[in-house]
Amino acid sequence: MSDISTCQTLRADRAITSWPLQATKAIQHIHSKGVVHCDIGIHNFLIQENGTLALADFGGSRVDGSKSLEAGLPHYRRPTLARDSYPTEMDDLFSLGMVIYEIKTGEVAYVGKSDSEIRKSLESQHFPDLAPLSLEWRTIVNKCWQEEYNNAEEVLADLNGLSHSDRRESVHSC
């Protein structure tokens, strides 16, 4: 397995174009088991031998309502997390939006910014530019960032509703 965060440019094959769906299914699965990952980020998805993704690093996860001090890397962190006492499923969904953005664009959000600059950008709703994405992908990512999804099943429904051509639009990879 290799770490997806080391990827630069990907070929648009079936395995890679399905990564956003695979990432969402992984999050949906852990949420269905009462687990909140608390550190969803491209750095915690591994590429298996067959090209599919595996979610990793559950060290800071919340299980069945336990509290976690883990909050993920700054650019994956939901802006309202500071107001909450601990990470929730909503934090994982916000972070999923960043993961999808990074998979689809091949760009890491907020490169070169300090943690405090990232926090200020997120708190003021200055998210990465979605122009490189199709309208359907922009909508899904923006809904993650705007906390419009109640659960991962809703994200899956939107992903499953994408047209075949939108699912196969260019993707960046290793």
Task: Tell where the protein language model's regions lie, with residue ranges.
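AlphaC helix of the protein kinase catalytic domain
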Residues: 2-11
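Activation segment signature within eukaryotic-like protein kinase domains
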Residues: 19-20
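Catalytic-loop of the protein kinase fold
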Residues: 27-48
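Activation segment/activation loop of eukaryotic-type protein kinase catalytic domains
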Residues: 43-84
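Conserved catalytic-loop aspartate of Hanks-type protein kinases
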Residues: 92
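Short, conserved alpha-helix in the C-lobe of eukaryotic-like protein kinase catalytic domains
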Residues: 96-106
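Helical subdomain adjoining the active site within ATP-dependent kinase catalytic cores
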Residues: 106-174
